[in-house]
């Protein structure tokens, strides 16, 4: 019986410890930056979540093995996905299939702040930048 109770407690501790709650309003760049600042919020084998601030642009690139969901918290600009360009602003969600070229040009005075969720876990190994 002790074994069952111990296993149950360990299971509950693991579940509770695996959850993360962050206030989006409290996320701020950790230091001064020229163009892009990235903060990892959470990661496991299934996905990685980042807070990203962009002052000017993110060059066209793709993730060979990852899908990416980008939710705009602040700012606006032009987001290109494949051959289409969209005007984007606070509250927009961009869904980017794996192996799809994408990038953004910021037009707001304040940096664009986004939440980026990539699946599976992002380790930076499959990001390919498009040559100019």
Predicted regions and their residues:
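Ligand-binding loop in jelly-roll beta-barrel domains
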Residues: 100-124
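Short acidic-glycine-tyrosine-enriched beta hairpin
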Residues: 84-98
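A short, N-terminal "cap"/entry segment at the start of jelly-roll beta-barrel domains
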Residues: 5, 15-51, 59, 129-132
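Short, conserved beta-strand element in jelly-roll/cupin
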Residues: 53-55, 64-79, 117
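Structural motif
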Residues: 57, 76-78, 85, 101, ...
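Sec-dependent signal peptide recognition
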Residues: 1-8
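Short histidine-centered beta-strand/loop micro-motifs
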Residues: 52, 59-64, 105-107
């Amino acid at each position: 019986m002790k074994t069952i109770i111990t296993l149950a407690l360990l299971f509950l501790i693991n579940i509770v410890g695996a959850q993360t709650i962050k206030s989006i309003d409290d996320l701020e760049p950790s230091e001064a930056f020229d163009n892009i600042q990235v903060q990892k919020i959470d990661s496991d084998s299934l996905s990685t979540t980042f807070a990203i601030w962009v002052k000017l642009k993110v060059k066209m690139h793709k993730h060979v093995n990852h899908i990416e969901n980008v939710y705009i918290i602040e700012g606006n600009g032009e987001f290109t996905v494949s051959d289409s360009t969209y005007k984007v602003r606070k509250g927009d969600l961009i869904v980017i299939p794996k192996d799809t070229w994408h990038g953004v040009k910021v037009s707001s005075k304040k940096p664009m702040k986004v939440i980026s969720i990539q699946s599976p876990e992002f380790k930076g190994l499959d990001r390919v930048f498009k040559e100019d």
